[in-house]
Amino acid sequence: MKEIIGNLLKKENVRQNLSSLRQEIKDENALAEALKLLAGEDELLVSFMGAEDAKTRKNAALLIGDLHMSQLSDEVFKAYEAEQMRFVKGSYLAALSQLDCKELLPQLMERAKELEHMTVTAENRKHI
């Protein structure tokens, strides 16, 4: 795990390392270790949600959720609002579902109202 996080800190093979770290932290002890190793690196994880590669953005958001980093809930929501790729949007919501984001409830409710008035195809429903 130290190697994976070291690679992330060096911004090497980011998409693959985010995915690998997500697999590693399924174990509770590994989750605690990852949180220690990533202490103070909130900005790094947030920066990955702004990556050019859509799968990197997706994995970054999901990792933040997996790590239960509620202090980043505002950043995850901002990234959700800015995201253009539909298949990534759902990952931001999945991440938010694992975070304490009560303060975002008014914005989430507003977004839900907007979506109610949109015409959504069956193919796109899972991405919203």
Predicted regions and their residues:
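Residue-level detector of extended alpha-helical repeat arrays and alpha-solenoid scaffolds
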Residues: V14, D27-L31, R57, V88-K89, ...
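Short, motif-level signal for alpha-helix interfacial/capping segments enriched in acidic residues
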Residues: L31-A32, L63
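Charged low-complexity stretches with an acidic bias
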Residues: A54-S91
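Amphipathic alpha-helical scaffolding segments comprising HEAT/armadillo-like alpha-solenoid repeats
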Residues: M1-L18, L35-G50, M69-A82, C101-L115
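Helix-start/N-cap signature of alpha-helical segments
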Residues: K10, Q23, D53, M85, ...
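Alpha-solenoid repeat junctions
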Residues: I25-K26, L37-L38, I64-H68, L96, ...
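Short, intrinsically disordered, charge-balanced linker/junction segments flanking boundaries
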Residues: L108, E116, A122-I128
